[in-house]
């Protein structure tokens, strides 16, 4: 995805304003689908997949709190040691897993990632989540779904569906990590 502040050449898919509107829309969808204000609603926990999934989870939690008045726990779930490509790709630094104080047992956990592609990161996240606790159910929220699934994975909340070629890359940029918001596609 590139290091912080790396310029990514390519075609802009989403501007900063588009990213903001899309995150707002996903937050509204989560509020509606989970019935957060219902007494029967399970506790909702957003767990971002590092790096940009953590930023997205934090922004979603802030938006949900602003729109519903309900504070949603959020954290980070490192999947590095659960990846199935550890031997074929350069080593990655371990990220910190941050589980909210209430844990994930019997909660509705929404895994959050920036881009859904093959589905392998989501599979790794499910494996990592199993070692953390036993949620009531698990859903998936992504900013961009670019297709080309290798595993039977489907997001419950999608900001934008973007058909891509396998030779293309989708780069999500957030100001907290990259200096600005946007989504770019490049070859």
Curated annotation (Swiss-Prot):
Keywords: Glycosyltransferase, Transcription, Transcription regulation, Transferase. The keyword Transmembrane does not apply. The keyword Transit peptide does not apply. It catalyses: UMP + diphosphate = 5-phospho-alpha-D-ribose 1-diphosphate + uracil. The gene is pyrR. PANTHER family: BIFUNCTIONAL PROTEIN PYRR. Its EC number is 2.4.2.9. It is an enzyme of class 2 (transferase). It holds the Pfam family Pribosyltran. HAMAP family: PyrR. This is Bifunctional protein PyrR. GO terms for biological process: regulation of DNA-templated transcription. NCBIfam families: PRK05205.1-3, PRK05205.1-5.
């Amino acid at each position: 995805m590139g290091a912080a502040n790396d310029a990514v050449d390519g075609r802009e898919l989403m501007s900063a304003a588009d990213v903001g509107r899309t995150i707002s829309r996903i937050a509204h969808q989560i509020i509606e689908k989970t019935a957060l204000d219902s007494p029967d609603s399970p506790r909702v926990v957003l767990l971002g997949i590092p790096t940009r999934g953590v930023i997205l989870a934090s922004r979603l939690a802030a938006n949900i709190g602003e729109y519903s008045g309900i504070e949603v726990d959020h954290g980070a779930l490192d999947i590095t040691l659960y990846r199935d490509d550890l031997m074929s790709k350069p080593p990655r630094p371990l990220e910190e897993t941050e589980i909210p104080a209430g844990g994930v047992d019997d909660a509705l956990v929404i895994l959050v990632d920036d881009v859904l592609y093959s589905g392998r990161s989501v599979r790794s996240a499910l494996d990592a989540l199993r070692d953390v606790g036993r949620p009531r159910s698990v859903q998936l929220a992504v900013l961009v779904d670019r297709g080309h699934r290798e595993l039977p994975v489907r997001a419950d909340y999608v900001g934008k569906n973007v058909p891509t070629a396998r030779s293309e890359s989708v780069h999500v940029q957030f100001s907290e990590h990259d200096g600005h918001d946007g989504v770019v596609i490049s070859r």
